[in-house]
Amino acid sequence: MDQPSVTFYRWDDMPKERVSEVLDRRLITGDRVMLTHVYIKRGGIVPRHSHANEQITYILEGGLRFWIGHDESEVIDVRAGEVLHIPSFVEHKAEALEDTVDVDIFSPPRQDWLDKTDDYLREK
């Protein structure tokens, strides 16, 4: 049996996709995990949504305010150097408190992001 090969990437070489006026992203995808850089302008909103994918968000620069749950009753501010874990199917919404760069990790990969069928992000 052949051993899988490894792949090396440089973020600056990855294409930056313009998703909306306030959100850009870069994607690196493996068989079972997706690593992304997400760039959100201050005041940019990620509308409430949920997905089957487990998510880990690590803020590199700036900060995001998250509203958790269908009723958005839990509010969590996540700033540079902090991490938020969002289990599968947990509804969440986010707003950029300032220009923000975050690393999102999804397992399994977000097929809607790969297919560009993530309309909830593209409407804003």
Residue ranges and their predicted role:
Residues 36-50:
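Conserved short histidine dyad/triad with adjacent acidic residue
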Residues 88-112:
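Ligand-binding loop in jelly-roll beta-barrel domains
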Residues 41, 78-91, 95:
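Conserved metal-binding segment of the jelly-roll/cupin
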Residues 51-53, 83:
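Amphipathic, hydrophobic secondary-structure cores in small proteins
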Residues 67, 79-84, 111, 119:
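A beta-strand edge to alpha-helix "cap/lid" segment located at domain peripheries
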Residues 1-32, 36, 119-124:
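A short, N-terminal "cap"/entry segment at the start of jelly-roll beta-barrel domains
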Residues 56-80, 90:
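A short beta-strand-loop-beta hairpin characteristic of the jelly-roll/cupin
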Residues 32-33, 53, 61, 99, ...:
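ATP/adenylate-binding site constellation spanning eukaryotic-like Ser/Thr protein kinases
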